[in-house]
Amino acid sequence: MPIVKLVILGSGGAVPKADRMLPAIYLEDWLGHRVLLDAGEGVQYRLLQIGISPSSLTLIAVTHMHEDHILGLPGLVITSKFLGGRLKVLAPKSMHGALSKLGVEVADSYEEERFKIKCVEVCHTVDACGWLIQWDVGYKLDLSKTSGLPKWALTELIKGKPVKIGDRIITPEEVADPAHKRFKYLLYTGDTAPCPEMWKKVGSVDVLIHEATFADDVSPSKAHEEGHSTVADAIEAARALNAQVLILTHVSARYPDKSRHRELASRISPPPYIYIPEDFETLLVKL
């Protein structure tokens, strides 16, 4: 079963707290990809604390130029160079010139056969990308349509490849379970106000990692003016995107803990299932 591991290395906003560092999330999938979403100050040490070398990262995806999301990047670049590696960094196009001077490989998308990640524009105060990850998890076959087929053919069909049995060519679509989705999606927003135009472009996702800078003590208009969201905004986004799982992060240092965020989230009947993790918490998400 496809499982994605998320380790929350920093769940805070612009100002760190002793138990809530600046934004950074480590993602590892069942295919072996290791992705760092944002690179807040001190993230290199946090990676080492969970046993991950910077040089082992498949790529780093930063959402925008604000310091709380990128101050950990120079250290990662330097360490990777010492270890003989060259980091791949995904970022908004407005950041490419500055990042290329660090000697990293810069782009705004990355693609392999079963894994894609691309920038989707969000609604912040500067040019900013949310990162949409797509996995090809293969087809789930309808057993009533595959009776009698050899095992090798089933394996190829699950991978999405047609097979030839005698004179007949069978495509995966012919024998697939229509209730099963071949592609699974995770969206990490970074900093954003409510962004209906982005929701329309994306369509739907399985997992949404959305900022919730504010609980309910700041007016929505004030939060949106600053390019941020409230808990209610994040829940609205999850429902607009049909997300089954919502993970709230980027919690302002104005809150001594996340109890108010959790209280607001507890009023919602799933879906989405809402998680408000602490730093160093690991989430295993089944796609």
Swiss-Prot record:
Instruction: Tell me the residue numbers annotated for binding Zn(2+) 2.
Output: D68, H69, D191, H250
What cofactor is this protein dependent on? Zn(2+)
What enzyme class is recorded for this protein?
hydrolase
Q: Where, by residue number, does Zn(2+) 1 bind? A: H64, H66, H124, D191
**How, per the record, is the cofactor bound?**
Binds 2 Zn(2+) ions.
- State the InterPro entries in the record: Metallo-B-lactamas (IPR001279), RibonucZ/Hydroxyglut_hydro (IPR036866), RNase_Z/BN (IPR013471)
> Which terms are listed as keywords in the entry?
Endonuclease, Hydrolase, Metal-binding, Nuclease, tRNA processing, Zinc
Please name the catalytic residues of this protein.
D68 (proton acceptor)
**Alphabetical list of SUPFAM superfamilies matching this protein:** Metallo-hydrolase/oxidoreductase
Q: Which reaction does it catalyse?
A: Endonucleolytic cleavage of RNA, removing extra 3' nucleotides from tRNA precursor, generating 3' termini of tRNAs. A 3'-hydroxy group is left at the tRNA terminus and a 5'-phosphoryl group is left at the trailer molecule
Name the EC number(s).
3.1.26.11
Name of one Pfam family that matches: Lactamase_B_2
An MF annotation (GO) of this entry: 3'-tRNA processing endoribonuclease activity
Q: Which family does it belong to?
A: Belongs to the RNase Z family.
| Job of this protein | Zinc phosphodiesterase, which displays some tRNA 3'-processing endonuclease activity. Probably involved in tRNA maturation, by removing a 3'-trailer from precursor tRNA.
Q: How does it assemble?
A: Homodimer.
The entry's protein name is Ribonuclease Z
